[in-house]
A protein has these predicted regions:
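Membrane-embedded beta-strand positions in outer-membrane beta-barrel channels/transporters
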Residues: 1, 117-119
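Conserved small-residue
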Residues: 1-108, 141, 148-152, 156-199
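Outer-membrane beta-barrel pore domains and translocons
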Residues: 3-7, 123, 134-136
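Short glycine/proline-rich turn/loop motifs
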Residues: 95-101, 207-214
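Residues that define the transmembrane beta-barrel architecture of outer-membrane proteins
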Residues: 112-116, 221-225
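Repeated loop/turn-to-beta-strand initiation elements of outer-membrane beta-barrel proteins
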Residues: 126-130
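Mature extracellular/passenger domains of Gram-negative fimbrial/pilin and adhesin proteins
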Residues: 197, 201-209
């Protein structure tokens, strides 16, 4: 006994001529999640040095993410690097509309797809077995929570005070100057930094900023059996 169903809803007409991503608009698929496509972590080799204010100087050919920064944060080694999908040389969300969304893309959908159920049963020597299974084959969600993102909120500082970096930092002999970075691209999380739960500089998408803008890498898989 097996059942499978699927559905998808598209807006055919809506009074939103600007097609703002934060609202409904004609042609929008209901439940779409917009965000950036994660590339990797920044390496020290992506920069040529630092400015006096601590911001990093991007090497030629590396797309700048300075427009995404919420002060006093600056992108640097160990931080999330997003893909420059529109080839402009700078990462942004355009005007936050369907027609001008910069490097944003649909990274998932929050509605359940491929809902299924099946039943198994039988008997043997007077023993009856009856099993029912139910699940969703595909569903995504963008959620901001401390369990997903350690040290994302300022209140998490006390919990993770001894885990401020999952990357190695090299210091001078007097321990006063950072001389280099060893970035592990296999790390689960980027350089930890508090206060990322607030709204960033990009319009039309869910909350999250700096390393935790809505993005493909940290999209939550809500499928289940």
């Amino acid at each position: 006994n097996f059942n499978l169903s699927d559905s998808k809803t598209k807006v055919t007409k809506w009074n939103n001529d600007t097609k703002l991503l934060s609202s409904y608009f004609s042609g929008k698929t209901y439940g779409d999640i917009w965000g950036f496509e994660t590339d990797r972590y920044f390496e020290e080799s992506d920069f040529t040095g630092q400015n006096a204010d601590g911001s990093w100087i991007y090497k030629s050919g590396v797309a700048s993410q300075s427009a995404l920064e919420r002060a006093p944060f600056h992108y640097g080694p160990g931080d999330i690097k997003f893909k420059d999908l529109d080839g402009s040389g700078a990462i942004d969300g355009g005007k936050g509309t369907a027609d001008d969304h910069g490097d944003l893309k649909v990274i998932g959908n929050s509605l359940p797809r491929y809902e299924y159920s099946f039943h198994l049963g039988g008997s043997w020597k007077g023993i009856d077995l009856d099993l029912f299974f139910q699940g969703v084959g595909k569903r995504s969600d963008w959620t901001i929570a401390s369990l997903n993102f350690p040290m994302m909120r300022s209140a998490d500082l006390a919990v993770y005070e001894h885990q401020s970096s999952y990357n190695r930092v090299f210091y001078s002999d007097d321990w006063k100057t950072i001389t280099g970075y060893d970035i592990n691209q296999g790390n689960t999380y980027p350089r930890l930094y508090p206060g990322n739960e607030a709204k960033g500089t990009v319009s039309g998408i869910a909350n999250g900023s700096n390393n935790y803008y809505p993005q493909s890498r940290y999209l939550t898989d809500m499928s289940y059996l």
